Amino acid sequence: MKLFVFFVAAVVLVAWPCHGAGYQRFPLRMKTGYGERSSEVKCASFRLAVEAHNIRAFKTIPEECVEPTKDYINGEQFRSDSKTVNQQAFFYASEREVHHNDIFIFGIDNTVLSNIPYYEKHGYGVEEFNETLYDEWVNKGDAPALPETLKNYNKLLSLGFKIVFLSGRYLDKMAVTEANLKKAGFHTWEQLILKDPHLITPNALSYKSAMRENLLRQGYRIVGIIGDQWSDLLGDHRGESRTFKLPNPMYYIE
């Protein structure tokens, strides 16, 4: 009996150094910790907080997030995120009975037309927004389509939904916006709503709420709203809609 106890104790002592030799106490903890790639981890968290609407009203992204944001925007993840959001919008729409007055509302900038070509020249959001420079870029009318939104747009049209574009662009951009939309493949819409410069609203959220109220008064039924900003999606007069938030970690519009 003593010999057996001694044998068990010896086995335990021999096995002890081996047990846990490759074991991670916190297997879900990032290996980077606070090392050289910590900015990548931090910026992924920043991006998540922006999309979850926990970080708001930021004027610029953190300086250390320029490269991670660039990698995200130009990599596969941004396209995949956009695809997933648009797919969910289509799945939702395809389950509904479509009426003649049913509309989907889309934003324009970085919702249907990509402004990434502008932001890649301005630090992916690390520079404060310059309205003059941005207007010059818009006036060129060369913004490409966001491909996953274009796919969804065509699918929604095929289901029988009417499309309304609702943007904070001013009315003086109507001609260039119409031309750019058509050039990018968005050929059909029920209404294109741009902002009257004489209309005073405290922010984009209030403006878009007011425009949705006008649409409801015209007899439309708002089924879905798709945008890259929370101000596209929140507020009053959303009708019966579900909202779908597209990714945009570069800037915030209140």
Curated annotation (Swiss-Prot):
Pfam families attached to this UniProt entry: Acid_phosphat_B
Keywords: Glycoprotein, Seed storage protein, Signal, Storage protein
TM region positions: none
Signal sequence residues: 1-20
Tissue specificity statement from the Swiss-Prot or TrEMBL entry: Accumulates in the stems of developing soybean seedlings.
Glycosylation, residue list: N130
InterPro entries, sorted: Acid_phosphat_B-like, APS1/VSP, HAD-like_sf, HAD_sf, Veg_Stor_Prot
SUPFAM superfamilies: HAD-like (SSF56784)
Residue ranges of the propeptide: 21-35
GO molecular function per UniProt: nutrient reservoir activity
Protein family: Belongs to the APS1/VSP family.
Primary role: May function as somatic storage protein during early seedling development.
Record protein name field: Stem 31 kDa glycoprotein
Naturally occurring in which organism (per UniProt): Glycine max (Soybean)
Lineage: Eukaryota, Viridiplantae, Streptophyta, Embryophyta, Tracheophyta
